[in-house]
Design a protein with these regions (language model features):
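Acidic, PIN/NYN-like endoribonuclease modules and their adjacent C-terminal/linker elements
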Residues: 1-6, 104, 108-136
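Acidic catalytic patch
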Residues: 47-48, 70-91
Length: 136
């Protein structure tokens, strides 16, 4: 994928983009990334999305929709990096949910930025190599 940087889209963005009250900027950004084939996901984000499905039909629709974008694997060393990052942050008095740390480590490992609506990622970006996409 030379020249095409992927953007890992966090669950917080997917939920907002799919909402009936969706922020038009959020929805537009997601649609642009999808259109340019730059949207990416990973296992933990898929699990979070599917856990939040409202009906069996919604679950199946989400599974099909999310299956059509780039999938970032989570090798064993990424789990270890997440554990180390969590340990290091806690030693500094910073507590971040492990799911968010894992998502950040997956983005870092794949050299892609993260599109989010979650304050934990803003904190992680200020303390780690995580690159985040901002809404204007």
């Amino acid at each position: 994928m030379p020249g095409k940087e992927l953007v890992l889209i966090d669950t917080s963005v997917w939920i907002q983009a799919d909402s009936l009250k969706a922020n038009s900027e959020v929805k537009s950004k997601v649609l642009l990334l999808l259109d340019k084939d730059r949207a990416a996901t990973c296992g933990i984000i898929i699990a979070e999305l599917l856990c939040g499905a409202k009906t069996p039909t919604n679950y199946e629709e989400l599974k099909i929709d999310i299956g059509g974008i780039h999938y970032l694997n989570t090798p064993e060393d990424v789990w270890l990096k997440a554990a180390q990052m969590s340990f290091d942050l806690r030693k500094k008095g910073i507590s971040v949910p492990l799911t968010d740390i894992l998502i950040a480590c997956i983005a870092i490992d794949n050299n892609c930025s993260l599109l989010h609506l979650d304050k934990h990622f803003t904190c992680l970006a200020s303390k780690t190599d995580l690159k985040i996409e901002l809404f204007e």
